[in-house]
Amino acid sequence: MVPKLFTSQICLLLLLGPLGVEGSLHAKPRQFSWAQWFSIQHIQMAPLRCTYAMRAINKYERRCKNQNTFLHTTFADVVNVCGNTNMTCPRNASLHNCHHSRVQVPLTYCNLTGPPTISNCVYSSTQANMFYVVACDNRDPRDSPQYPVVPVHLDTII
């Protein structure tokens, strides 16, 4: 059982590794803070089919986003990761506001499979349990004062 699970995880890393994580530091809709946009793009408590789940993101971006990762955890749990030790962001060495999760979380990786027509974006789904790295910043005035530091970018999954 262990070799099969290990092999599956290696295959998933090989699949996801070169693709990276298309992060939330791309243009965001003006009406949202970076933390709000992070939540819309990456927090989803229960797994949904990617084609359905991506509709909200694509509606705001007015395009079919190539790939996206949904963490099946709470915003509060990701905020807690912001309290972990600062590190250089793996995907952007000029940023030093990243934080590595201490526990793996269930996630869904969505990959655009069909032609990118905004009226019909079709995605494949890959489920996994993985660690993640997020960039965090001080909250925007539009964010809840409950959290002084908030996640703003999903840098990578490991």
Swiss-Prot record:
The modification 3'-nitrotyrosine is found at residue 60. SMART domains: RNAse_Pc. GO terms for biological process: chemotaxis; defense response to virus; innate immune response in mucosa. The active site is at 42 (proton acceptor), 153 (proton donor). Substrate binds at residues 65-69. Pfam families: RnaseA (PF00074). GO terms for molecular function: lyase activity; nucleic acid binding; ribonuclease A activity. One of its GO terms (cellular component) is lysosome. Belongs to the pancreatic ribonuclease family. Interacts with and forms a tight 1:1 complex with RNH1. Dimerization of two such complexes may occur. This is Non-secretory ribonuclease. It comes from Saimiri sciureus.
